[in-house]
Amino acid sequence: MKILKLFLPIAVSISSLFATWFDDIPRTITQPNGEIIDCFVTGDQYGRRLHDANDFTMIMNPEDGYYYYAIPGINNELIPSTFIPGTVDPKTYGLEPGLAMSLAEYNRNKDFYHNSESERDSRDAPTSGEIAQINVFIRFADDPVFPNPRSYYDVVFQADEGEPSLRDYYWEVSYNSLWVNTFHFPGSIDDVNTAYQDEHPRGYYQPQSGTNPDGYQNDNERTQREHTLLANALNAISSEVSPLTDIDANDDGYVDAVSFVIYGQPGDWAELLWPHRWSLYSQTVTINGAQVWDYLFMLSESWYFNVGVLCHEFFHVLGAPDLYHYDGGGSPSPVGGWDV
């Protein structure tokens, strides 16, 4: 069956900010001295961890910006040890593999996003007919231009008929009753993937540390920066959206579907630079009279930018919940091959 090509073992949890769970995704981090460390990331938007091939967790020390192997703190929170990955064998020093964020901390992160939204967090887009999705490309002040043409990024949204894409997936699983058209902004000339360029560098949207003094310091500051970024991008392209495009098919006063593709790769630990769905509750942005609320947030230059992740996040736009329960340990148990 063609649909099964798109199912990925991605797990998730019920909340107002919907997340995407990944296991053992290869990552490369650079220490302040320039040393490169090949590692993996496991987790989701609420909490994730970097770890080596033997599952020993690594964490940044915000004082010097270096990554160290993690150890349990007094209250079982993860804190950096004095052992730098690549310089010691963690087994020799009795370190414990598989250390993860505590369930209490994970739930605190989840509750923050849930409690910060209003009653509109339960609104859903239409599940039949046609949906016009607005997608905005964004790069930061210190980013290069997107390396691939617009047609390359468009494929995951709406490939040719019969090929895996967001549009094809929902057309098939809805028994030919839901058709999703995606309109990309800013407009493209000669297939160049133009993007809204923000005034701040990438580090502004990452946690503060000894090597990133201008980063955000807490969840409230992170929220303000993310929402301001997206509001500015939307205001910059809003005049390009044709009034003939029906972006509010169910006439509830809200844009049915909005997504953002941010240049670069996802961040580490609980950074905002991670695929997620949220709502623009702290800003008031309208396009042709409809307010922007729900949105999808994607990163462009990595394995994460694929049909499976996009389809997973879009299910939340339609009102579907996440399908796993984090227990403070290893990988959660999703619903197997039926999850996307």
Placement of each model-derived feature along the sequence:
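Active-site-proximal segment of zinc-dependent metalloprotease catalytic domains
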Residues: 97-99, 103-334, 338-340
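N-terminal prosegments of processed precursors
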Residues: 19-123
